[in-house]
Every structure is written in structure tokens, then in C-alpha cells.
């Protein structure tokens, strides 16, 4: 009996000693470069880079902790409720690889087997845009969050359709997010003229009721590419207005963000990009929107559509007060899920693009 026990322990020991080593070069770098270094790169909005072994090993414990708790990569949407295109979600196997790497001493491995270091994303993805619109250089000096609008003339003299839109931050370290509007009125133009600095301050929009949202940018988000045959209508004589959010504490930083747009003059099916659905007091079924001090309240909002549409993407938003949000469509006996965010975080807002457009009956 003692001999059998000894042989069993010896066999287990041999198996443990010959277990494959998880290394940065062959196993960890591909994960980080695919899922993290869009932001964690020199010149990116993240506070430190994860490009190269030395940067990764210096943050090894933080990587293991943040990914195991799914704080990183940031993806607030509940993947058990709805799946999307361009998801930033690590698989269970990838998380285990990162855990094993740290547990085994965060070894570099054969550096020659590592993927090439990613380059800072300073350029654009959109090829041959019809419009290249750039805001004037603006020096950011702010102790509080600054929301600043810039008017970008288009020169468009006939109605057309936008088929793709991309925001390229001029300074990725300071641009928190960008909202893109079109407006045919002179309100934004006059506000811009009244402010001696480039652009003008405006919180919650452009300050014009006629502005229409046509695009959103957050760090790491892909350019809008509408499905074939669809487009967002852009009106003749319109200006593009971008509202750029600069976080608090920025000093003497220059930005010159630009917008690239692809156009089509054909007959396309119109896309409607609107922040208005379930976004006001009139849609609340248990309003008004009032929360007494030291209380938590749940509000329900409902909009009845009188037309049929195809949903391409959803962009839930609650700014700083909301804690969780869920959106869905009830069609007869069917419930169509759109998005569920159990723990809302203003800093990780984004647009969620559906894998296929979803038809919603009126």
C-alpha cells in the first residue's frame, strides 16, 4: 500500500513539473494587443501602456485582477441578455491564460515569437471619405468637465445620405467622447461667433433644438458603417456640429478632432439616429423624474411607435445619476431584447451595434 501511494505522488509531481509554461510572448501579448492596446498605448486615453513585455509585467497583477473581475476590457452590457458586433469581451479561456501567466511568474518567453507591437492609432480607418471636416486647434485648460461645440461647415447644397462616419480625435489622451450633429439653423453659428475662443460651451447638446444627432464616438469604438442600402440623411445647407467632452484637470493640451463622412446621392432607406426615444418625462409611466435624498427609485419609460423600423444600434444613456438600465421591445407576445446594463458607468458609455438589424413592428 505504501509503494502504491509513493508512485501516485511521484506521477502527479512529474505531471506538474512538465506543465506547459504560459508566457507573455506566445500567449499573453496576442490577448493584450487584440483587446487592450487600442486605449493602453502611448498617446492613448488609458493612463498607461501595455505594449511590450516590460509594460505588461509591470502591471501583471492589475491585469489579472481587472480581467478576472471583468472590469477590463470595459464592456458594461450584459452578454447573457444580448450579443453585439465588435464586442470587447475576453473569453473564459483568455482570462485563464492571463491568470496562469501571473501565477507562473509572468515569464517573457521567447520574445521572437511575440506579435509585432501595435502602433498608436493616429490615423483614420475610413477610405476615400467625401467630407473631411476638422475643428480649429483648441487649447484645453479646464479644472472641470468641459463640453465644447465646434461648427464644421459642409458645403453640401443637396440632400444626401451618410453611409459611414468616423470621428478621429486630435488628441486621444483628452477626448472623452464626441457627439456629432447636423443643423441647418444659424443658432450654433451665432453661438460660435459670440465666444472669443474656438467653438462654444454647451452641455447636453448643441444649444439648438433643430440639431439632429448623426454619430457618436467613444474611445475604442469602431466607425459607423451603415448596412448596405441604408444611410442617414444629411440636409443641404447643413453644418456639422461636434460636441467634444474634455475631462476635468486638463492643462495646456491641444486638440484638433476631425470627422470623416462618406456620402451617397442615391435612393437609400433612411436611418434615424435619435436620442429621443424614452428620453424625456412624457415617456415615463411612473413619473415625474424626482428622487428624494437618500432614496433609490426605479423608473419605467415607454414609447409606442406608429411606424415599422429596423433597429441597427442602441445607445443607452443616463449620464451620472443612473445605476442600471434595460431596453427592450414588446411585440404582441414576444419580447425583443436590446440592451441590459446592470452597472451603469458614465465613463464607459457607447453605442452597441446589433449583429443584424432587428425589425420592430408598429
Language model feature labels by segment:
Residues 15-17, 36, 173:
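A composition/secondary-structure signal for short, hydrophobic, low-basic-content segments
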Residues 13-14, 63, 188, 328:
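Single-residue recognition of alpha-helix boundary sites
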Residues 74-75, 79-84, 114-160, 166-310, ...:
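Beta-strand-centric surfaces of beta-sandwich/beta-rich domains
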Amino acid at each position: 500500500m505504501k509503494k502504491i501511494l509513493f508512485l501516485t505522488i511521484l506521477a502527479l509531481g512529474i505531471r506538474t513539473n512538465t506543465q506547459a509554461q504560459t508566457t507573455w510572448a506566445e500567449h499573453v501579448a496576442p490577448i493584450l494587443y487584440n483587446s487592450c492596446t487600442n486605449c493602453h498605448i502611448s498617446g492613448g486615453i488609458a493612463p498607461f501602456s501595455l505594449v511590450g513585455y516590460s509594460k505588461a509585467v509591470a502591471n501583471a497583477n492589475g491585469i489579472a485582477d481587472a480581467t478576472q473581475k471583468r472590469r477590463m476590457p470595459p464592456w458594461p452590457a450584459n452578454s447573457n441578455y444580448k450579443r453585439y458586433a465588435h464586442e470587447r469581451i475576453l473569453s473564459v479561456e483568455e482570462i485563464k491564460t492571463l491568470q496562469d501567466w501571473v501565477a507562473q511568474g509572468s515569464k517573457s518567453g521567447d520574445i521572437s515569437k511575440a506579435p509585432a507591437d501595435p502602433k498608436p492609432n493616429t490615423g483614420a480607418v475610413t477610405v476615400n471619405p467625401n467630407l473631411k471636416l476638422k475643428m480649429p486647434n483648441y487649447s484645453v485648460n479646464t479644472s472641470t468637465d468641459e463640453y465644447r461645440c465646434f461648427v464644421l461647415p459642409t458645403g453640401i447644397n443637396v440632400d444626401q445620405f451618410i453611409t459611414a462616419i468616423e470621428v478621429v480625435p486630435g488628441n486621444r489622451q483628452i477626448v472623452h467622447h464626441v457627439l456629432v450633429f447636423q443643423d441647418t439653423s444659424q443658432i450654433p453659428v451665432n453661438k460660435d461667433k459670440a465666444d472669443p475662443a474656438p467653438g462654444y460651451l454647451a452641455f447636453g447638446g448643441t444649444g439648438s433644438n433643430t440639431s439632429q444627432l448623426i454619430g457618436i464616438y467613444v474611445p475604442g469604438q469602431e466607425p459607423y458603417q451603415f448596412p448596405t442600402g441604408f444611410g442617414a440623411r444629411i440636409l443641404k445647407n447643413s453644418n456639422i456640429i461636434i460636441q467634444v467632452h474634455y475631462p476635468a484637470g486638463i492643462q495646456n493640451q491641444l486638440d484638433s478632432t476631425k470627422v470623416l463622412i462618406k456620402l451617397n446621392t442615391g435612393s437609400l432607406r433612411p436611418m434615424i439616429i435619435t436620442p429621443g426615444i424614452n428620453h424625456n418625462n412624457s415617456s415615463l409611466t411612473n413619473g415625474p423624474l424626482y428622487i428624494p435624498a437618500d432614496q433609490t427609485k426605479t423608473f419605467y419609460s415607454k414609447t409606442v411607435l406608429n411606424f415599422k423600423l429596423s433597429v441597427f444600434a442602441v445607445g443607452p444613456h443616463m449620464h451620472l445619476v443612473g445605476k442600471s438600465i434595460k431596453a427592450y421591445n414588446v411585440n404582441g407576445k414576444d419580447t425583443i431584447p436590446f440592451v441590459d446594463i446592470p452597472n451603469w458607468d458614465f465613463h464607459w458609455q457607447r453605442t452597441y451595434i446589433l449583429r443584424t438589424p432587428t425589425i420592430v413592428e408598429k
